[in-house]
Structure formats: C-alpha cells, structure tokens
C-alpha cells in the first residue's frame, strides 16, 4: 500500500508543479480535450472497420466515455510527468527534514547504536560522557556507530518512499558503495570525537551525505514514470476498445 501511496504522491506532486506553469497547463488541457475527443470518435467508430452495420448501445456509449476520460487523464499525466524529478527532489527534501524530527526514530537508532557498539566489548561504558551518549574511542567502534546511523537512515527512506527508493537505486538492495561512502564520511567527521553525539546530529550528517546520491538517482524518475503511465494507459484502454470490438464482431457473426 505504501508503494502505491508513494507513487501517487509523485503523481500529485508533478500535477501541482504543472499547474504552477499556467500557460503550459492551459496548452496541456487543450491538447487533452482534443485527444480525448479523438479517443471518443475512435472508440465509437473503429468497429466499423469490419462491421458497417454495428450500432453502439448505451453500454457502449459509456465505454466510449471511459476511453475519453482515460485519454484526457493520460495526456495531463504524461505532460506533468516531466516534473516528476522535481517532485521527487521535493520528496527527498521533505524526508530529510522529517527524519531529524522523528523522535521515535532518533530514539530507536540511538539505542541500536548503543547496543551494537556495546556488543563489540572494546569500550569502557562505565566512563561518564559529556553528551549523554556512549564511548566510541576505538576505530572499530567509530565504524560500527557510523554503519548503524547510515543503514538506519537509508532504511527510513526506503520504508517511507518504497517506490522512489526502487528508482533511485534501481535494485532490490542499496548498493554497498552507497553505505560505505556515507560511513566513511561520518567516520571522517567524527574522527576527533571520543563519544557519540546526539542522534539528531548524527542522523542529520547521514542525511546530508545521502541527499546528493538520492538526487542523482532521481534523474531516472521521469522516463520510468512515463513508461509506467503509458503501459497502464494502453492496458486499461483495452477494456473499452476490446469490449466494443468484441460486441461488433459478435454482432457481425449473428448478422451473417
């Protein structure tokens, strides 16, 4: 369900951006109306290619209306999808702002970092810390702490944006080099620290490193989104055109 919601959020985001360009939106509506009219004409008359005597019924008129509406919606979506990259980047920015304000997530990732570092058994947890964190004096601890925050931040993005994440990374799993790159930068940033800082700061650093990678992958959103909508349009249009064509063919058999 989240996958569909994430896709629809990109769809609506793209439409909103399109409406922010009044002239382009107006031209799009004109083209959509024209093509929708052609869609009506095509659905109502294409069956006469093999059955000149066929007359559409009220049911067929409804199917023609469906084909018309689908054509109109398709044109608007297809044009608006030129802005899906911009919509995706807005989603990435919103995610980046939201993740550092999600107290439940920050608490869970801090606890996970504490547990993972403590499991290593190489730090003295009896020492007091200045920021209420946990000791990360050893290189192994720094690496483990960075891995926890990097992977947790990525998992948060994947959970909240399942559709977008599949496009950004184009694989079932996040490329290992992406994780390693974030880990390396976190370690570099905290190399002079002897303890963990508040989870919000560490997550923010992971977000800052991850956002450019996400924006880079977001370039693929436009062709993929348009490919999906074209495939859906053709698939769904088979219903009205197929039913009308089948009715005309059946009527031809009865007449003969």
Q: Model segments located where?
A:
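Membrane-embedded alpha-helical segments of integral membrane proteins
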Residues: 2-50
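Aromatic-enriched hydrophobic runs in primary sequence
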Residues: 3-22, 97-108, 133, 184, ...
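Short, aromatic-rich amphipathic segments at membrane interfaces
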Residues: 8-22, 195-235
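Juxtamembrane interface at the cytosolic side of transmembrane helices
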Residues: 34-67, 222-256
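Transmembrane signal-anchor/signal-peptide helices with a preference for the extracytoplasmic
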Residues: 44-46, 70-101
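Membrane-embedded hydrophobic alpha-helical segments
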Residues: 61-71, 181-182, 186, 190
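Long, solvent-exposed extracytoplasmic domains/loops
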Residues: 93-213
């Amino acid at each position: 369900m989240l996958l569909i919601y994430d896709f629809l959020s990109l769809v609506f985001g793209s439409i909103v951006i399109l409406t922010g360009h009044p002239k382009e939106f107006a031209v799009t509506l004109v083209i959509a109306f024209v093509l929708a009219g052609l869609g009506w004409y095509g659905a109502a008359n294409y069956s006469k290619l093999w059955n000149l005597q066929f007359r559409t019924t009220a049911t067929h008129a409804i199917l023609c209306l469906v084909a018309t509406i689908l054509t109109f919606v398709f044109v608007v979506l297809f044009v608006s999808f030129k802005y899906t990259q911009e919509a995706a980047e807005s989603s990435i920015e919103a995610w980046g702002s939201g993740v550092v304000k999600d107290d439940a997530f920050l608490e869970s990732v801090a606890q996970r970092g504490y547990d993972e570092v403590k499991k290593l058994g190489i730090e003295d947890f009896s020492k007091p810390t200045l920021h209420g964190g946990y000791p990360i004096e050893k290189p192994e601890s720094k690496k483990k702490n960075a891995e926890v925050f990097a992977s947790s931040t990525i998992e948060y993005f994947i959970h909240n944006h399942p559709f977008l994440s599949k496009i950004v990374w184009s694989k079932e799993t996040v490329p290992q080099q992406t994780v390693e790159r974030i880990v390396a930068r976190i370690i570099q940033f905290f190399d002079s620290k002897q303890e963990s800082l508040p989870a919000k700061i560490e997550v923010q650093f992971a977000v800052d490193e991850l956002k450019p990678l996400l924006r880079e992958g977001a370039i693929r959103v436009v062709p993929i989104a348009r490919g999906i909508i074209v495939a859906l349009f053709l698939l769904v249009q088979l219903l009205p055109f197929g039913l009308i064509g089948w009715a005309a063919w059946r009527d031809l058999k009865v007449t003969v």
